[in-house]
Amino acid sequence: MSNATNNTLGSLLPQLEAAANSNSLYGGMVPNLRFNITMIVIWGILLTIHVVQLLMRQYWFSIAFICTGILEVLGYIGRTWSHSNVADMDAFLLNMICLTIAPVFTMGGIYYQLAKLIEVYGHRFSLLPSPMAYSFIFICSDIVSLVVQAVGGGLCGVAVTDGTSTTTGNHVFIAGLAIQVASMAIFLMLWFHFLFRIYISVRWEHINSRPISLSLLKISQTEVDYLYREKFHFLRLEPKRWVFHYFNLAMTVAVLTIFTRCCYRLAELVVGWDGYLITHEWYFIILDALMMAIATVTLTIFHPGFAFKGRSTSIPITPGHVDPETLPHTDDVEDILDTSDSKQFDIEKEEFQASMKYPISTFKQFMSKIANLFSSKKKAKL
């Protein structure tokens, strides 16, 4: 009995010491070592899978998911590091900044998938003037959020180093997260509007009435497919393509879980660095770690490269509310079933570069600023 008691006390001793440490950056909470090491392994596996999927499907937007994986691994390395030293600012910033901004890149990839889906189902289902507008508007919003969070994180780091108040940095950081949450809320409304139009409105159009009843569920997608864009009917109707058939559901799960996680992060910062949420790790485990894991695993199984036949099918994003092939004097000479891997790879590469040029460059600048912050802080200590 005494041995068991001693072992228990021995395992709790580091946590008790940390709780008594007034310099703790976690309000006395010690990040769980086993959990965070497990998350490093899980995210390492997911990261590897997405790299392989990028090579297999040559789907360039896998890079957005790869960026998320790298940041998640770095973030959990920071939390593991903090387990042995809860007062270490480098470990805390690595954890806080990387895990906070990681979803930005996943959402950047998701925004682009909506543009692809509008191309597949038809431009008339787009609420915005162009399918690509979804990517541009929301990726730009994420860039603003990312920059504001970077400024807030930098101000907090400098304030802690100088021994001054972090209030200003906290407020700026919260503003950045609030922009991200507001942007995602708007995207969710547009996403559900799109789903309503392709699943409910087309059935109303098919039966020429607007009943609100479960009878609509009896109408199969095959029956209403003639109301979608004919050019990509092969993607929608092939019976064995279960990845595409459930892709919209997978997207919904991913967006809702990431939105839940971002709301939690915003609430965590509003409550404060020593508030109830940040000092109780179970909230982080369920509302952050689990939510991001569900979103990423879902997008790994229902990968866009498989859903859209990334190696063999070209789905260029085009402007306007009307499908290009229906416009007068439009020569539809593109072979959408072109089996040339190199041609499709070039198309996806150009689309990726056009949509992700600014997020990638901003991310590089952001990480450079963080590195400079760490470097200057270490020099100040010396």
UniProtKB/Swiss-Prot annotation:
Residues 1-34, 79-90, 157-171, 263-281 are extracellular. Residues 56-57, 112-135, 193-241, 303-382 are cytoplasmic. Glycans are attached at residues 3, 6. It comes from the Eukaryota. Pfam families: RTA1 (PF04479). GO terms for biological process: lipid transport. It is a multi-pass membrane protein. Keywords: Cell membrane, Glycoprotein, Lipid transport, Membrane, Transmembrane, Transmembrane helix, Transport. The chain crosses the membrane at residues 35-55, 58-78, 91-111, 136-156, 172-192, 242-262, 282-302. The keyword Transmembrane applies. The keyword Transmembrane applies. It is found in: Cell membrane. Induction: In response to loss of mitochondrial DNA in a transcription factor PDR3-dependent manner. Induced in response to altered glycerophospholipid asymmetry of the plasma membrane in a transcription factor PDR1-dependent manner. Its main location: membrane. GO terms for cellular component: fungal-type vacuole; plasma membrane. Disulfide bonds: none annotated. Catalyzes the ATP-dependent translocation of sphingoid long-chain bases (LCBs) from the cytoplasmic site toward the extracytoplasmic side of the membrane (flip-flop). Involved in the establishment of the functional lipid asymmetry of the plasma membrane. Regulates intracellular levels of LCBs, sphingolipid precursors that are growth inhibitory at increased levels. Belongs to the lipid-translocating exporter (LTE) (TC 9.A.26.1) family. This is Sphingoid long-chain base transporter RSB1. It comes from Saccharomyces cerevisiae (strain Lalvin EC1118 / Prise de mousse).
